[in-house]
Amino acid sequence: MSFPLHPSLVNGITKGNPSFQGGVLKCKCSTSPVTVTLRSNVAHNHACGCSKCWKPEGALFSIVSVVPVDKLEVTANGDKLAVVDPSATILRHACTGCGVHLYGRIEKDHAFKGLDFVHTELSDEKGWQEPQFAGFVTSIIEQGFDARHIDDVRAQFESLGLESYDALNPPLMNAIAAFTAANEAKA
């Protein structure tokens, strides 16, 4: 059984170019689109099943990655951006015209502060880092997906060469745990 994981995964995974230097993300508005320029490749690219990330219509997962804050610049129509949920840890800046999330930034003290979350599918350039894993897989159940088929979803990711996790991958979870431990030691 096959499920609509994400449009960019339909034909398998296209390898990125390790020397790729970035490009422009653009919202879906046909006139006056918001553009964001990334001056580096991304890291930790992954399929995300959480309920907060922007997903293309019909997709079960988003494809999201990070870039250093100083490598991201809103380059056109930034006045159309608004934070989706000001109480969230990741402040997702979405276009008020089309609803697409252009970037997410963490302002409070967090292991990932200094990294912006982005969706490279919003770019026409080729060479972005390919997805590395699938995270928050069981979160799609909370959004209405039939739990009886979650193992089929995991198998579909496995067929693409991606490990699936119910949180982030171990290196990212280790970073969060180390950050938490260091902060608790200071208290």
Swiss-Prot record:
Annotated Zn(2+) 2 binding sites: C48, C50, C53
Pfam families: GFA
SUPFAM superfamilies, A to Z: Mss4-like (SSF51316)
Residues that, per the record, bind Zn(2+) 1: C27, C29, C95, C98
Catalytic activity: S-(hydroxymethyl)glutathione = glutathione + formaldehyde
UniProt entry keywords in alphabetical sequence: Lyase, Metal-binding, Zinc
Cofactor binding, per record: Binds 2 Zn(2+) ions per subunit.
Residues annotated as domain CENP-V/GFA: 20-166
Keyword Lyase in record: yes
Co-factor(s): Zn(2+)
EC number: 4.4.1.22
Root EC class: lyase
A molecular function (GO) term: S-(hydroxymethyl)glutathione synthase activity
Associated pathway: One-carbon metabolism; formaldehyde degradation; formate from formaldehyde (glutathione route): step 1/3
InterPro entries, A to Z: CENP-V/GFA, Formald_GSH, Mss4-like_sf
GO terms under biological process: formaldehyde catabolic process
PANTHER family in the record: CENP-V_GFA DOMAIN-CONTAINING PROTEIN-RELATED, GFA DOMAIN-CONTAINING PROTEIN
Function noted in UniProt: Catalyzes the condensation of formaldehyde and glutathione to S-hydroxymethylglutathione.
Similarity comment: family membership: Belongs to the Gfa family.
NCBIfam families reported in the protein's UniProt record: formald_GSH, PRK05417.1
Name of the protein this chain belongs to: Putative glutathione-dependent formaldehyde-activating enzyme
Organism: Verticillium alfalfae (strain VaMs.102 / ATCC MYA-4576 / FGSC 10136)
